[in-house]
């Protein structure tokens, strides 16, 4: 699996200390700009950065210029120094200290070779010793104890040896060196003795030599010749001939690397642009990694992390990838899968047959999420895997579970402090809260009727008086100018007169008098009255003395209204520093979740310390404090119905922590309840929920026994089908997988006139939306004779075959019964979908959850299978109906049965929804209405035709058998019992139909020919007895029968009444016209067409067919926009989707596409497939 790419044409070396890689411009190449510059660069490989930007490394950590280009590069620790050494085309040895590289002046350059240095190798037994090999057979041994003063010693020169292409020190025996040369000679040296020990020779150039990691006499040489691209395995105990040959490359091999931790892995690459993985022990090629566009000249495993290796090619890339591919291997992909893998088409396609030695588990047990433990025991080569429950410190969550159920009474049973009293008051309602705040409950007193005169009316002034019109106030009153009169009263400080006058004046005058009053009064009462009267209670909150906090809170509760929560929280903020308990009361009464949770969350650590003083373990103390916090929060939310307000990220983190702890104890249901409280946008919550949902699924079995494999895990190969642990729930659409259950038959409806058989074609339906069940009509075909073969009437929109309860289940024309190996009901004659059982235990090669491809459609099984739609076997065979057999019905138009049970590439059932009467078919429920056979719907994967060709056609099942001539079964005469049916072999679904004279074998993949087939054979085969009809209503009288029967042995064809012509379509603009797109839809067309034009050049040629098809379908969408056919909601969603593509926000674009397809399937036509492919291609390419 590709992890990183470096855009450099360079040789490279892995760092022995950390995940870094050094690159040096390779010799013998020319850049696109014909530059002769050379760079030495060091790159940080951050495997945690999985972004699209992080995939391609563009910024080296260190970059310096070099005087010459490199043939080879090594990075090695000598003990005191970390050295990078380069073999250059100028013949000089360049040495850098990796930790001190600043520029080219920091290198030490030594020239001893007379020509270019081709290869370098450090001695694993002597870290300061380096050997270099070059042209003309020159080999030098270097002492790098002091990197600034390298000391060289010539090992030997053999002019016949040619250029030294590769060096390798023996991994076991000290001082043993192997050198390979361009003339095919591989020489074994004793470096200390400067002595040649032996040679192995090949008649072709040898490009690379490697020693076996653990066997001192074994080595491999690679041949660079295109005519014989092989790797030879030698054992020096007999060097006369190679011990084995590894063949697989089509051109010369340039580089080989033998894994030091597991000798069963060997990498090779060469001129055929390929990188192969081998098992040298079995001489088997394990697989091929993604091919480059040019020669791959070096491949090397990382010594610290052998799962990783890098390959350099003349394509201009260094690719860093893993040994094991986790993207599904070479499994055949469906059309929809191609685009998901478009961006990874050149990645590895290898599934290792054995686990690397460094991954073989040294233990035999493993803990699993959700309080599970897996134990493995191996006896006599057989491994037994057991999955059980494991609980460490049992946590008590009963009280929280009770609260979540809504029962708060138990939470207040114990005396737990002042906060719990407040919570209890909140849980009991308003009266209890008023009582807690010492606010008396005002009871309404019954009104007392008093007919006596108003006592105050007797207190009115009486007697004669003078108006004193000269008084300005009196004059203003007389003239009705009350505002002026009030102003004069206020000016003379006559507040009582002003209040009396304001009663008859406007509200503005009243406010003026009140303000004047409050301005002159300084008492607390006046301040309080002002706050209440002007609704400025924040003045009381901010300025009143905190010793009266409870009275302030009561005032706020009485007059605060909608602002009470905010005002009470503000009062709590004032109290928090000086009086934590009273502040908590204010927060609780305010109902502010953020304030309450923030206060309690800050006290968790303090509570932990208190618990640890009582010799409680730190983890137990932490969980106890966390549990108290969660319990109080849960009670608070239930008591006040508090909603998330403000910033409650701290609370969400505590919810998640608590959920993880209880999930680890196996209480997955409680954990799910708390994760459900987190918003979907909260970071990481989606992954947590997915993990919980998977863990909560019931396992099929807790014990699995199988042969032990090389992975240390069971080898699953049993052909015995496993029972599925999942039973689909019946829905309004019925279930095509639900077992057939006998049900009481409903009385049959009266038959309408025979013209009901002519069903007008229905418009084509969306192939990607689940099909609703077919409507039930009142028409029932004529009843069959008890002795006649059972008719298998089929409705294209209701594919489940129906059975006549009055027809015998076995006869000479019966097809062989089929049996679904999974015990689910599938129509007879249809393909049975089988899938490999899913294993409950994970192994090395198991794919990640997000990488598992959707289930593929299996091919129909040609072997004899028995039908799962056969009626249940009765306890005793049924007796034939009383009376003579009735003649077979004639002139019946039926359609053949349609196989059901497959799914298309988008996960929806093929063939429509199952019949809602499937369970009643064997017990006499009426068969569905015969339907006119119509042309099949368009193939969702075929290229779209031009809009002018898209005539609306009725939708039928694309896998329906080809209709043919009706062949009448032989008549059964009265008193003559039909011969016993013989079990016949099932018809080959791929064979051509036989001639007329025998019931034609149906081909489920043949296109309709326009005729009508006779009734297929019943599902129950010969030898099987149908169950007796149980408490069923007699069938209704059928439509009038045609008195003319077809001649014996000949086909009977029935004319089909033509369907009424569809209404004329509204005038549309011509296809391809884009001038009438409304302004609201114009941005959709502009954005999609522009982005599509930019994306197309980046899609590989192999997908050209899909590109053309997608483009045609997109043009259909543009035609709809041009005709203003789209609904406003659809236009809005398409606008969002196009903007997401333009902004490269592909997850949002994919989510919007899925939302459109599922929420409005009726509005989605053929263009939706093109839009889906557009989004998938864009997400795969990502940048253009």
Swiss-Prot record:
It comes from the Eukaryota. GO terms for biological process: COPII-coated vesicle cargo loading; endoplasmic reticulum organization; positive regulation of ER to Golgi vesicle-mediated transport; positive regulation of protein exit from endoplasmic reticulum; protein transport. It holds the Pfam family WD40. WD repeats lie at residues 4-44, 65-106, 112-152, 159-199, 201-244, 248-288, 291-331, 366-388. SMART domains: WD40. Component of the coat protein complex II (COPII) which promotes the formation of transport vesicles from the endoplasmic reticulum (ER). The coat has two main functions, the physical deformation of the endoplasmic reticulum membrane into vesicles and the selection of cargo molecules. This is Protein transport protein SEC31. It comes from Yarrowia lipolytica (strain CLIB 122 / E 150) (Yeast). The gene is SEC31.
């Amino acid at each position: 699996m590709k992890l990183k790419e470096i855009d450099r044409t360079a040789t490279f070396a892995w760092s022995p200390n950390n995940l870094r890689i050094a690159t040096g411009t390779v010799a013998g190449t020319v850049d696109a700009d014909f530059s002769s510059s050379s760079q030495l660069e060091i790159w940080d490989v951050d495997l945690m950065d999985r972004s699209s930007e992080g995939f391609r490394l563009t910024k080296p950590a260190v970059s310096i210029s070099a005087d010459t280009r490199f043939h080879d590069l090594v990075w090695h620790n000598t003990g005191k120094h970390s050295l990078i050494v380069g073999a250059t085309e100028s013949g000089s040895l360049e040495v850098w200290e990796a930790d001190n590289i600043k520029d080219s002046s920091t290198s030490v350059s030594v020239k001893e070779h007379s020509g270019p240095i081709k290869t370098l190798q450090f001695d694993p037994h002597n870290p300061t010793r380096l050997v270099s090999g070059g042209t003309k057979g020159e080999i030098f041994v270097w002492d790098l104890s002091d990197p600034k003063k390298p000391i060289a010693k010539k090992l030997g020169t053999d002019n016949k040896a040619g250029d030294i292409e590769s060096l390798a020190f023996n991994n076991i025996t000290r001082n043993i060196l192997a050198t390979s040369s361009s003339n095919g000679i591989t020489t074994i040296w004793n470096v200390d003795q400067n002595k040649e020990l032996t040679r192995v020779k090949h008649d072709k150039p040898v490009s690379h030599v490697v020693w076996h990691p653990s066997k001192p006499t074994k080595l491999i040489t690679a041949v660079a010749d295109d005519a014989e691209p092989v790797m030879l395995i030698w054992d020096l105990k007999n060097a006369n001939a190679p011990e084995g040959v590894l063949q697989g490359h089509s051109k010369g091999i340039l580089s080989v690397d033998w894994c030091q931790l597991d000798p069963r892995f060997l990498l090779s690459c060469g001129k055929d642009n390929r990188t192969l993985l081998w098992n040298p022990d079995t001489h088997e090629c394990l697989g091929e990694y993604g091919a480059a566009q040019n020669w791959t000249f070096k491949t090397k495993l990382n010594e610290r992390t052998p799962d990783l290796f890098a390959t350099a090619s003349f394509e201009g890339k260094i690719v860093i990838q893993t040994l094991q591919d986790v993207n599904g291997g070479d499994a055949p992909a469906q059309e929809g899968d191609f685009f998901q893998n478009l961006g990874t088409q050149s990645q590895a396609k290898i599934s290792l047959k054995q686990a690397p030695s460094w991954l073989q588990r040294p233990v035999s047990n493993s803990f699993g999420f959700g309080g599970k433990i897996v134990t493995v025991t191996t006896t006599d080569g057989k491994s037994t895997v057991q999955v059980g429950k494991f609980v460490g410190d049992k946590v008590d969550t009963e009280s929280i579970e009770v609260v979540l159920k809504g029962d708060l009474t138990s939470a207040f049973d114990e005396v737990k402090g002042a906060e719990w009293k407040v919570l209890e008051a909140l849980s009991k309602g308003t009266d209890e809260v008023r009582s807690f705040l010492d606010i008396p409950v005002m009871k309404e007193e019954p009104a007392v009727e008093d007919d006596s005169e108003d006592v105050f009316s007797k207190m009115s002034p009486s007697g004669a008086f003078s108006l004193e019109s000269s008084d300005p106030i009196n004059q203003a009153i007389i003239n009705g100018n009350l505002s002026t009169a009030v102003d004069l009263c206020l000016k003379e400080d006559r507040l009582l007169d002003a209040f009396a006058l304001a009663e008859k004046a406007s509200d503005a005058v009243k406010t003026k008098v009140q303000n004047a009053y409050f301005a002159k009064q300084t008492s607390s009462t006046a301040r309080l009255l002002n706050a209440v009267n002007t609704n400025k209670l924040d003045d009381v909150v901010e300025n009143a003395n905190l010793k009266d906090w409870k009275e302030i809170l009561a005032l706020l509760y009485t007059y605060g209204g909608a602002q009470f929560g905010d005002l009470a929280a503000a009062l709590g903020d004032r109290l928090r520093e000086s009086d934590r308990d009273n502040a908590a009361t204010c927060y609780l009464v305010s109902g502010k979740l953020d304030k309450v949770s923030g206060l309690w969350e800050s006290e968790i650590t303090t509570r932990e310390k208190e618990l640890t003083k009582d010799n409680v373990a730190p983890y137990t103390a932490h969980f106890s404090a966390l549990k108290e916090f969660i319990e109080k929060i849960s009670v608070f939310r239930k008591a006040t119905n508090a909603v998330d307000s403000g910033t409650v990220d701290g609370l969400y983190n505590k919810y998640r922590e608590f959920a993880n702890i209880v999930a680890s104890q196996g209480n997955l249901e409680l954990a799910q309840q708390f994760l459900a409280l987190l918003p979907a946008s909260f970071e990481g919550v989606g992954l947590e929920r997915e993990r919980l949902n998977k863990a909560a699924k019931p396992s099929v079995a807790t014990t699995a026994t199988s042969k032990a494999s090389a992975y240390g895990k069971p080898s699953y190969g049993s052909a015995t089908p496993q029972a599925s642990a999942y039973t689909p729930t019946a829905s309004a659409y019925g279930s095509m997988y639900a077992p057939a259950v006998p049900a009481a038959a409903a009385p049959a409806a009266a038959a309408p006139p025979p013209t009901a058989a002519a069903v007008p074609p229905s418009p084509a339906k969306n192939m990607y939306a689940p099909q609703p069940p077919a409507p039930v009509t009142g028409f029932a075909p004529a009843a069959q004779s008890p002795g006649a073969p059972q008719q298998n009437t089929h409705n294209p929109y209701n594919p489940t075959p129906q059975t006549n309860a009055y027809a015998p289940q076995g006869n000479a024309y019966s097809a062989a019964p089929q049996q679904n190996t999974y015990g689910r009901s599938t129509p007879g004659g249809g393909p049975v979908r089988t899938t490999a059982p899913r294993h409950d235990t994970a192994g090395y090669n198991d794919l990640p959850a997000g990488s598992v491809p959707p289930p593929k459609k299996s091919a129909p099984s040609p072997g004899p299978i028995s039908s799962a739609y056969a009626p249940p076997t009765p306890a005793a065979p049924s007796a034939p109906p009383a009376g003579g057999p009735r003649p077979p019905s004639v002139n019946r138009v039926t359609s053949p049965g349609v196989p059901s049970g497959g799914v298309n590439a988008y996960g929806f059932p093929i063939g429509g929804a199952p019949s809602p009467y499937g369970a009643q078919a064997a017990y006499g429920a009426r068969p569905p209405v015969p339907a006119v056979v119509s042309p099949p719907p368009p193939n969702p994967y075929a290229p779209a035709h031009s809009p002018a060709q898209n005539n609306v056609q009725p939708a039928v099942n694309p896998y329906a058998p080809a209709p043919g001539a009706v062949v009448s079964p032989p008549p059964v005469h009265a008193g003559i019992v039909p011969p016993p049916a013989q079990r016949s072999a099932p018809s080959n679904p791929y064979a051509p139909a036989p001639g007329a004279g025998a019931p034609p074998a149906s081909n489920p993949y043949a296109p309709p020919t326009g005729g009508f087939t006779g009734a297929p054979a019943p599902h129950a085969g010969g030898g099987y007895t149908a169950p007796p009809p149980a408490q069923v209503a007699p069938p209704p009288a059928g439509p009038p029968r045609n008195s003319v029967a077809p001649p014996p042995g000949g086909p009977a064809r029935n004319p089909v009444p033509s369907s009424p012509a569809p209404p004329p379509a509204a005038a549309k603009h011509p296809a391809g016209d884009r001038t009438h797109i409304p302004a609201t839809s114009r941005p959709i067309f502009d954005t999609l067409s522009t982005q599509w034009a930019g994306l197309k050049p980046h899609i590989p040629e192999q997908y050209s067919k899909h590109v053309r098809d997608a483009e045609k379908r997109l043009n259909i969408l543009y035609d709809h926009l041009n005709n203003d056919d789209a609904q406003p909601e659809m236009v809005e969603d398409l606008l969002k989707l196009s903007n997401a593509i333009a902004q490269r926000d592909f997850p949002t674009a994919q989510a919007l596409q899925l939302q459109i397809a599922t929420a409005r399937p009726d509005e989605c036509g053929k263009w939706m497939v093109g839009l889906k492919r557009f989004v998938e291609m864009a997400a795969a390419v990502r940048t253009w």
